[in-house]
Amino acid sequence: MSVGNIQSPSNLPGLQNLNLNTNTNSQQSGQSVQDLIKQVEKDILNIIAALVQKAAQSAGGNTGNTGNAPAKDGNANAGANDPSKNDPSKSQGPQSANKTGNVDDANNQDPMQALMQLLEDLVKLLKAALHMQQPGGNDKGNGVGGANGAKGAGGQGGLAEALQEIEQILAQLGGGGAGAGGAGGGVGGAGGADGGSGAGGAGGANGADGGNGVNGNQANGPQNAGDVNGANGADDGSEDQGGLTGVLQKLMKILNALVQMMQQGGLGGGNQAQGGSKGAGNASPASGANPGANQPGSADDQSSGQNNLQSQIMDVVKEVVQILQQMLAAQNGGSQQSTSTQPM
């Protein structure tokens, strides 16, 4: 029948081709739209990432949050434009670095290094004081109008002696620690009492075997570790205080004597003649005295310079004494009663 022929698929090739073409076109159209949307999204994300990177670079390298650029609400620049991200005071890294930089160097510096630095400054000041006592190269310092106002010979001797002793101690400390004669025991485990002074000492590797000290005195292992008899550290009666403690105590005595000398006679080291430095200008000059010392005002200028230099010396001495007190207390477990300088 004709009805059967109409229902046969083989008799409808045109309808089948139409349906296939329609389905194919619909699928291609839908796929191209999805691809276009994905491409647009990809381009937007690339633009957003570029903007975030540029904002991070302009903010000084605060790129910690750039990885979170694709925000859910599309506002990817919110994190980059946040004032707190660009505020240096709220940046934890630089802030901690600044705090470290602002800490007083004296608190971070090793006490021994601080002590040696102050002693070097003190040596320079004392040398300047000695040079000031010798105007025009007069070794005896009698040049202020012949009035002996400075008492140069006596004062120079006191300062020169203190300077020499301080330089000796500075050399001991800089040469591997005080008590170098037995400092080797610190490494070999023999420096039980004064082990703190043994680091870097002369003959440290042979400390337990009795390594040679500074002047050749052998350290007899645990028995004589830290002995400073060979390091010129006990010539003032402090032989019983071995190692670093003895040297620090000797330095304390030297500084106390220096302070007393300066308090009694200043940098001149003696009592001025009647009339003081102002009257020295008209006094008859001694033989070999500097002619410039008789000019009006020269004695006043020298006195002003001496007072300024003396003030600087006293300031450094006070700082040295503070460090010495701390180091002596640490050496003796806080039981050491060290002598402090008298106030100016």
UniProtKB/Swiss-Prot annotation:
Effect of residue 269 to A: In strain: 8107
This protein's record includes keyword RNA-binding: no
Chief place of localization: secreted
Biased composition (Low complexity): 8-28, 65-83, 215-235, 280-294
Ranges of compositional bias, category Gly residues: 138-156, 268-279
Subcellular location: Secreted
Biased composition range(s): Polar residues: 89-108, 295-311
Disordered: annotated span: 1-28, 58-108, 134-156, 211-242, 268-311
Modification comment: PopA2 and PopA3 are produced from PopA1.
The UniProt record lists the keyword NAD: no
Keywords tagged on the record: Hypersensitive response elicitation, Plasmid, Secreted
One of the protein's GO biological processes: symbiont-mediated perturbation of host programmed cell death
Disruption phenotype: Remains fully pathogenic on sensitive plants, suggesting the bacteria produces other pathogenicity factors.
GO cellular component terms given for this protein: extracellular region
Function summary: Acts as a specific hypersensitive response (HR) elicitor. Has activity on tobacco (non-host plant) and petunia but is without activity on tomato (host plant); PopA3 seems to be more active than a PopA1-PopA2 mixture.
Protein name, as recorded: Protein PopA1
